[in-house]
Amino acid sequence: MKRTLIIAIGVVALLIVGFTISGVAQETQSNKESRQAQHEARQQQRAQRLAEYREHLDSTILSHNYRFVPETMQQLPAGMMRNLQNPCYEIIVWSEAVDVCIPFLKGYTPPYYPVVFNYVLSSVQGYIVEQTDYGWHVTFQSTMFTATTFTFSFEIYSHYGAATQTISSPFYNSMQYTGNIFGI
């Protein structure tokens, strides 16, 4: 009798443990499915936000109303990279003018001397906007009230909002700036 009772208790205990493990396994499977659904929803939300950002940046560039804020500058070829901390440095492109306030190193051979281009250009020549695989390529030219023609070239990356801007001239080494594009 004792033996039967011990066997019965053992069987009941095994059944309880079995049901508990089965319930935990079902709950774990349910949690995995729930997490997978949440993960897919977050991926879709991020993809939608990225697409909306690209569309916003595309419309900003096409409107000809944007602001470039440089973070670094480098004289080409192979000049020293300099961080720009002054928040006043920017190039603002409007449909009717271009506002330039940006540092530049003049000179073809050392010693170079730093200047700040601080002009409002009421007219620019050859304003061209081209869509590329990675974003946009914008170029225009201006004399900036000198005898030298300066070419401004923007490479704008739609995926992450960054831009590389190059100012070139036949009489000076080119300067390259990296920064961000903002709508105005």
Region locations from a protein language model:
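Helix-rich interaction surfaces within compact, conserved domain-sized segments
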Residues: N31, V124-I184
